[in-house]
Amino acid sequence: SEAMLYGNQVHKAAEHFIKDGTPIPKKFEYLNPIVNSLNAIEGDKHCELRFGISYDGEKHKETKFFAKDVWFRGIADLVIVDGEKAFLVDYKTGKNAKYADTAQLDLLAAATFTHFPEVNHIKSALAYVVSNEFIKKDHTRELQSSYYATFDEPLEALAAAEEHDVWNAISGPLCGW
């Protein structure tokens, strides 16, 4: 779709700016204040960082993104690691943050803690680049297991629906029921 293409172009422009200083194209120059401030943060910058996480029922471990034992896959738009602290950013190209959901940040923070064992605190944000809104959240290593559990309840409901072949409508902004 056109919106998807636009989102991909924005992500690529931000990635190339952070990675190698490629100037932001004119049509996306509204990104400059955001990417300049992110680029000024101290630390090792990782763009489009792919996480593969396995889970054996007791412990979450790092694995390859397409490994057979992968339990969770996620891609962080930008992770900046500076010793025990990190910054995690997910760019959003929607009009505004009205339907912002930070559950994605919880899972990516959990994966960041797994990938970078030295990190103990993460400041994360959904960066709505068009409206210049930031939905922020702090994460601590002590709560890592609760971040991984973010989708336990909906996944259990999905498994039950599949087992009993009962698919009840769920009210929400994207549901016409």
For each feature predicted by the language model, list its residue ranges.
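Catalytic cores of nuclease domains that cleave nucleic-acid phosphodiester backbones
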Residues: 13-98, 103, 115-125, 129-132
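Regular secondary-structure segments
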Residues: 11-18, 155-159
